[in-house]
UniProtKB/Swiss-Prot annotation:
Entries under CDD domains matching the protein: Ribosomal_uS17
Family named by the database record: Belongs to the universal ribosomal protein uS17 family.
A GO molecular function held by the record: rRNA binding
Annotated gene: rpsQ
The protein's name in its UniProt record: Small ribosomal subunit protein uS17
Annotated source species: Maricaulis maris (strain MCS10)
GO biological process: translation
Stored Gene3D superfamilies: Nucleic acid-binding proteins
Amino acid sequence: MPKRILQGVVVSDKGAKTIVVRVERTFLHPLLRKTVRRTKRYHAHDEANAYKVGDQVQIQECAPKSKLKRWEVVTVAA
């Protein structure tokens, strides 16, 4: 099974080797037939502490690294 890859914006880089990425998704509400936006925050591993708040990044699933971290940064999104 391939690993999932998500794209989002770094909203926090305060943790050691950890960033928080906000991922936004849109979907059509089944009853209202209106496009709805939802966001979710993911803790991701950043080995080199290279990413700063506001960066667009891609994160990929990985084996659990801590209680909250199950994602790691792959690249900076264009």
